[in-house]
């Protein structure tokens, strides 16, 4: 039995990262001692996790100490402008995100807890562990939850202009886990980091499956630019006078672009065909209202929403992103469309809407694919990694 610590920015938010960490922690704790460290504000955030945790898992809230007005200003300027990869800017960014007092507290916390292995969830916590790796006794790895572009795209990547910072910190770690082979190759070629691929598990098992007779396309995720929902409005508008004329579109989720999408719906006259739910907790119930899942994302690491769709037997229409390769084969579990070709996306939606038999066959294939992604099977791959690191 190993003592494992997991560092995550948020455990009590509603998102894919929180969901999959909860799922795997529930598996790890069957054989190990697991503590999850989360940065939620103790006074403002509740204690309820949307995704059930085993009572054996210890959850510890921690503060981001050592902060100051100047550090907050530097972070604000970075998020608004991106700053640059210059030496001075990198020095300022490290001090702004990882002040010395903060790093010292983490060194003491990990060493005092006698952890065998620490797992940093996503880039910000991977860098934290990298900066203190030389001063802790535990092995340390990162578990990255986005595509390479999602992190390092110069315009929209979360860690834009911090690639060198990430690289210097991450190369000190004992391991790195990514979600697909495309990310693995880019980490190797552009960062010089050898990464292990472990897929995310499906987030639930369901006896109830989607009804292929329903005439509804469904999608799920944050209503933000990278999800490409404007393409769905184009596609449903293109197809509304053909085989999709009786079909509706349900967007499960909310976000900063909800207002803009609603305005576009009105301009296109789609108010009766498209609805946006806002943030909901009963995602499974909402997904069952559809018979085809559509995903027009610009990038994905390993879309949990697709694993959920597969589990419910929903055929999938998606762009040809590398993240889709392990999940959906064109003509098997769904239709894969050349990236960002809105007209072909609309044609794929029309094709599935027009064939009950195609939807039924793809639904059966989707269920078989979901069975390969059970948490128990994914946990076996993690155990292999733990054994290699700790032997």
State where each predicted segment sits.
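Donor nucleotide-sugar binding/catalytic pocket of nucleotide-sugar-dependent glycosyltransferases
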Residues: 139, 148, 165-206
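Conserved acidic donor-binding segment of nucleotide-sugar-dependent glycosyltransferases
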Residues: 330-331, 335-342, 351-356, 371
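An aromatic- and histidine-rich active-site surface loop
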Residues: 94-107, 117-137
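Aromatic "clamp/platform" in nucleotide-sugar-dependent glycosyltransferases that forms part
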Residues: 279, 298
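Membrane-proximal helix-turn-helix segments that form the acceptor-binding/catalytic region
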Residues: 104-112, 158-176
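A conserved mid-protein helix/loop that constitutes part of the nucleotide-sugar donor-binding site
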Residues: 15-23, 215-240, 251, 256-262, ...
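Nucleotide-activated donor-binding/catalytic signature segment of Leloir-type glycosyltransferases, i.e.
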Residues: 262-278
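Short hydrophobic beta-strand element within catalytic cores of glycosyltransferases
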Residues: 315-318, 328
């Amino acid at each position: 039995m190993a003592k494992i610590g997991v560092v995550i920015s948020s455990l009590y938010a509603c998102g894919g990262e929180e969901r999959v960490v909860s799922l795997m922690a529930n598996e790890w704790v069957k054989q190990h001692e697991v503590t999850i460290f989360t940065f939620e504000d103790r006074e403002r955030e509740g204690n309820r996790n949307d995704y059930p945790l085993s009572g054996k898992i210890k959850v510890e809230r921690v503060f981001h100490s050592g902060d100051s007005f100047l550090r907050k200003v530097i972070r604000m300027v970075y998020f608004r402008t991106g700053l640059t990869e210059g030496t001075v800017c990198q020095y300022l960014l490290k001090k702004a995100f990882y002040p010395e007092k903060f790093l010292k507290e983490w060194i003491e916390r990990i060493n005092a807890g006698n952890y065998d292995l620490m797992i940093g969830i996503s880039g910000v916590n991977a860098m934290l562990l990298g900066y203190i790796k030389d001063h802790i006794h535990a092995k340390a790895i990162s578990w990255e939850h986005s595509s390479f572009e999602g992190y390092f795209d110069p315009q929209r990547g979360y860690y834009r202009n911090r690639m060198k910072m990430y690289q210097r910190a991450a190369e000190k770690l004992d391991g790195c886990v990514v979600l697909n082979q495309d990310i693995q190759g880019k980490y190797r070629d552009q960062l010089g980091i050898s990464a292990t691929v472990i897929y995310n598990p499906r987030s639930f098992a369901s006896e109830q499956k989607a009804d292929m007779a329903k005439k509804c396309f469904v999608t799920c995720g944050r209503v933000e630019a990278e999800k490409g929902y404007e393409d769905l409005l184009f596609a449903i508008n293109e197809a509304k006078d053909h085989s999709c004329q009786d079909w509706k579109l349900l967007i499960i989720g909310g976000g900063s672009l909800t207002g803009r999408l609603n305005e576009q719906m009105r301009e296109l006259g789609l108010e009766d065909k498209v609805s946006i739910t806002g943030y909901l907790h009963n995602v499974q119930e909402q997904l069952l209202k559809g018979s085809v899942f559509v995903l027009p994302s610009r990038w994905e690491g390993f879309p949990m929403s697709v694993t959920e769709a597969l589990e419910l037997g929903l055929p999938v229409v998606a762009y040809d992103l590398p993240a889709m390769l392990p999940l959906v084969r064109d003509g098997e579990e769904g239709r894969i469309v050349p990236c960002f070709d809105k007209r072909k996306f609309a044609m794929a939606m029309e094709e599935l809407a027009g064939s009950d038999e195609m939807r039924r066959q793809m639904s059966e294939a989707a269920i078989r694919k979901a069975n390969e992604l059970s948490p128990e099977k994914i946990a076996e791959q993690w155990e292999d990694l733990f054994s290699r690191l700790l032997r």
